[in-house]
Every structure is written in C-alpha cells, then in structure tokens.
C-alpha cells in the first residue's frame, strides 16, 4: 500500500469559513485545483482564487434551494474511486479523482439553540450533501484526505511541504477518524433534537419532551489518559464535552505540577462548583469530594485562613478552590501550612506561581472567570443504564425562605443560614453543615442517618475548639424526626435552615420552639449521592 498520496484536486464546501480563504490560497499556490460550492465558491472567487463551481464540473445545476449540490456521481465517484482499481470506469464516465475534501456541516446546534427555532428551521439546517461527502472521503482514506476541522489546516500544509505535495496514510487515517467523529456527533445532535420533539410532533403535548429524548446520544472528546482510575487496578481516561461554555475543571489550564489523577479531577470539580456559589471572596477545601472547610472573607487569604480552621486534619492533602486570583500572600500561606494536591482559581499571579513552584507536586489550575451558570445535564452510571437529570442549579434567596418557628432569625443567623445552605448543596447526603460568621465550623457528611451527621458536625467543631453557640445549621433534606434538632440544640445551634416536607414537620418545629431555635424552610431539597 502506497503510504503517500499527492493532493492535486480538492473540493471545498464549508459552513464555518474561518481560515478557509488562507487554506485555499495555500493549496492553490501548491498547484492544487479547487472545486467548490455555493457560498464557499463565491468567497474564494471574490478573493481572486481560481475555483471551479461543482455545478460546472458536474454539468448539473444546484437545485431545490441548495438542497441538491454535490449529490452526483462525478463528485462521489471522484471521492470513492479506488486509485489503480477504478481508473478505467472513472475515465469512461469522465470522473476526475478528488484527492482532498474540505467540509464542515450546517450549524444545526446553533440553529436549534436559538430562541423561537421551529422544527422547519431545524430541518432546513440538516446537512445532507456534507456528511455524505465526509463519509465517502473517510471511507476512501486510503486515497483521499478528509478535512473537517479548521485547526488542521496549518498542519496539512506543513506536511504537504515536507512531502512534495503529498499526505501520508497515517495522516489520512487520523483525519478519517476525526471525520467519523464529526458526523457521529452531528447525527447525534439531530437524533437528540428530534427525539425531544416526539410528544409535540404527535400532538400528545403542547411542549417538546425537553432535555430527554427517547434515545440519548452523547459525544465526549478524550482530553487525557489517566495513570489509573479511582483505584490503581482500574484504567481510566478523562473525556470532555466539546464547546463547553462555562469555566470548569474540563476547560481549566494546568500551569504547574504533575499530571492530574482521576480523583484529583473529581475533587477539583467538587471544589470549583461549590466556590462558584459565592459572590464574595471565598475558599473551598475539599477532601474525597466533600467540602471540609468553606468560608468567605475580606480577601482570599482571609477566606482560606477561615476555611482551613474548620478541619485542618481533613484539609491535609485536599483540593483548594478560590473565586478570585491566587495571590502571592495566599500561596505562601498554603505552602507553609499544609500539603495540598490541587489549587484552582480563575487566575494566578506570577509571584504566586513562583511560590507554588517550590513544591513540585502541587498542581495549580486556572479556569478563568465564570459568568452565569450554564444549564446542562448530570449523569450517574448504574449497571446496565444511565440516570440523567438536570444540573442542580437551584438556590433560594432570603425573600423565598419561610420562617416556621415562633422566633425570627437574627440578621447574622440569616446570613449564616444562607451561607451554610449553599455549602450543604455540595456535601454528600445526609448532609449537615454548621456555620458561624460566614465560615463552616462543622460538617457532617454521608451518614445513613441525619442525626449522626448532626452529631458529627458538632464533634468536628468541638475538636477544633470552634464555638457552636449562636451558629446556624443547614440540612440538605428534611428532618424525619426531632432528634436532629435536639442534637443541634445540645451543640449550641440557634438557627436551622432545611427544606421541610416531613410528615413530622410539626414535631420538628415544636422541638425548635422548645429550644428557642429559629427555623427556616426552603421548600427545596439538595440531595447529593
């Protein structure tokens, strides 16, 4: 099998025209004949490039408002024809070999994301000729190069220059993989969209099925292989969504340290998503996917110092997230005080990076600032299936809370209640969080009974010498019995925030009244499993 194939004729037909003129100029300068369609052909001609319209090449005009352009034997024969095997039949029918196909597809995702997009709009943005050419070229990668990503343009020209106008089989095969990934993702988007429209289409509902089509097709891109998974006997890799719109661990840049582990990524995600809840300078320290210390402060140094005091023992080897730039003073405090696996922040100063560089094992990630949180889906794998739900972006403000006890909370209790409610959302259920003066003072996570989570939170506070008296307590779900309130009162809690909704709410409220505790209902639960 010949490893190299010269590129003498290329067909270019793209929706995303970024870089296409420069790429076409580079091809033409190297003697490549250019074929093109529609808007791409007009653009290239306007730039003075010698380009042949596909309709002139085939002798068949574009028709049906552009629905039929490239679906012709002279196009697909030129792409699919096997060099050295189909030459005679190609010559008989005046089919010229096409050595490169440059295609990206109609912007279906952008179309359906637009407010007010109708099914008819979506249908008109389903590309037919494009995917057909992509698949034809990818199938015949032995002889044809298929280019679907503008990010490959420069590398292709460099390789052609290094190989006297040819591309290697290895490159053509790699391009074919990208092509099939491209069409698979495209078809998945269409299938998901159509699947979500089934009830409305059949008149069963006035609304579409929403985010949950009857068949779910997912496309993720491998970002990196991991040394191992959650445990050393498990293999693992990290896959990310394409075109992620929110600052996240998936989009973060590692600026220092050794490769991230599977557990590093999971814990960093937990820390970053928690710290995003706060507008003030905040710090979140996570261990085994649970916050072990959270605080807001006048600066990130102040926030870190307060978060660390919650549970210094658990903070050892933890993940630290900030919602402001990592500065030198804070970096020095962390490095001097504890062993840390990962620090993530929107940015890091040069001075801070010089300080953390002294500890080679410390991984530093920057993720950029985040704006409004982006709705999406969460997944949980079960044996033989996948649970899918909307991302939990729910949160309540002070105006939405219901005071259900005789005593009203003080202003400070209310602030602390809202603070620890945000933290409880990210603690594994059953979750109890004690907070005072905008810092956690005790966290009880992952217990099978809520009362034991409450007791653990109190024990944590006592172990660190943190005063619970006058603190607020958050519970991620309702109290099924009064025992959790009794445990909180014994520890010194004076305000409780919880969803409510238990059949024993009256009993729980009565317990709070007995202890002089103010209780707030959110009417929103935050289970986390």
From Swiss-Prot:
It catalyses: (6R)-10-formyltetrahydrofolate + 5-amino-1-(5-phospho-beta-D-ribosyl)imidazole-4-carboxamide = 5-formamido-1-(5-phospho-D-ribosyl)imidazole-4-carboxamide + (6S)-5,6,7,8-tetrahydrofolate; IMP + H2O = 5-formamido-1-(5-phospho-D-ribosyl)imidazole-4-carboxamide. SMART domains: AICARFT_IMPCHas, MGS. SUPFAM superfamilies: Cytidine deaminase-like, Methylglyoxal synthase-like. Its EC number is 2.1.2.3, 3.5.4.10. InterPro entries: AICAR_Tfase_dup_dom_sf (IPR024051), Cytidine_deaminase-like (IPR016193), MGS-like_dom (IPR011607), MGS-like_dom_sf (IPR036914), PurH-like (IPR002695). Gene3D superfamilies: 3.40.140.20, Methylglyoxal synthase-like domain (3.40.50.1380). GO terms for biological process: 'de novo' IMP biosynthetic process. It comes from the Bacteria. The modification N6-acetyllysine is found at residue 287. Keywords: Acetylation, Hydrolase, Multifunctional enzyme, Purine biosynthesis, Transferase. Residues 1-148 form the MGS-like domain. One of its GO terms (molecular function) is IMP cyclohydrolase activity. Pathway: Purine metabolism; IMP biosynthesis via de novo pathway; 5-formamido-1-(5-phospho-D-ribosyl)imidazole-4-carboxamide from 5-amino-1-(5-phospho-D-ribosyl)imidazole-4-carboxamide (10-formyl THF route): step 1/1; Purine metabolism; IMP biosynthesis via de novo pathway; IMP from 5-formamido-1-(5-phospho-D-ribosyl)imidazole-4-carboxamide: step 1/1. GO terms for cellular component: cytosol. Belongs to the PurH family. The IMP cyclohydrolase activity resides in the N-terminal region. This is Bifunctional purine biosynthesis protein PurH. The gene is purH.
